A protein has these predicted regions:
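Pre-Walker A (Motif I) flank of P-loop NTPase domains
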Residues: 1-2
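Glycine-rich phosphate-binding loop used to anchor ATP phosphates in small-molecule kinases
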Residues: 54-107
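Conserved substrate/cofactor phosphate-moiety recognition/catalytic segment
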Residues: 18-64
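The conserved Walker
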Residues: 9
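Conserved lysine of the Walker
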Residues: 13
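Short loop/turn segments at strand-loop or loop-helix junctions that form parts
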Residues: 32, 77-81, 113-119
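A glycine- and Lys/Arg-enriched "phosphate-lid" helix/loop adjacent to the NTP-binding pocket
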Residues: 90-146, 154-162
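Hydrophobic anchor at the beta1->P-loop junction of P-loop NTPases
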Residues: 5
Length: 173
């Protein structure tokens, strides 16, 4: 089972995965591409979000998806759709190459767990307008099948809301 936790920044992906791994040690954790690229490979990203930076993270995410065969137990911190959403929000004219890469790679997953932004979530975070806009784009992709990715791939998408414990139950293990 290859599961990706999807959502805008500062939504609780890391917390959810940490709790999941406490009781599911048999799963391999694929961390956030940004963290791996910076800490393990020494790559540098701009202080301001950019299409180029998110496209690089998308490429890396796709590489990591291809490393794991069907049947392996892997939990990914982000999925290609996340990066598509960021790119679409930053520059809708730049989505074509990203869309192609996402549609080719999404079938490497068995399930996506989408963490939507709650209406009352007013955290003090970096780039709050970007955070909200990306959540809106993710919502359109998952709930309304924008770009046709979900229907074309047949991937199972689960929406997880509430506390960390409630979200854990949504993962399905």
């Amino acid at each position: 089972m290859r599961i990706a936790i999807s959502g805008t920044h500062c939504i609780g992906k890391s917390t959810l995965i940490g709790e999941f791994l406490r009781t599911h040690a048999e799963f391999v954790h694929e961390p956030e591409p940004y963290i791996v690229l910076v800490e393990d490979f020494g790559e540098e990203f701009g202080a301001e979000p950019s299409v180029e930076d998110f496209y690089r993270q998308l490429e890396f995410n796709v590489e990591r998806l291809r490393l794991h065969a069907p049947g392996e137990r892997v939990i990914y911190e982000r999925c290609p759709i996340d990066f598509l959403a960021y790119i679409a929000v930053l520059d809708s004219g730049a989505i074509e190459p990203a869309l192609g890469l996402v549609s080719e790679s999404i079938n490497q997953l068995d399930r996506i767990v989408y963490l939507p932004l709650a209406d009352d979530d007013e955290m003090d975070v970096e780039f709050p307008k970007l955070r909200k806009a990306v959540d809106g784009r993710l919502s359109a992709i998952y709930r309304e099948d924008a770009f046709g990715l979900v229907s074309a791939s047949g991937i199972e998408v689960v929406e997880a809301t509430g506390s960390t414990e409630e979200r854990l139950r949504s993962i399905g293990f």
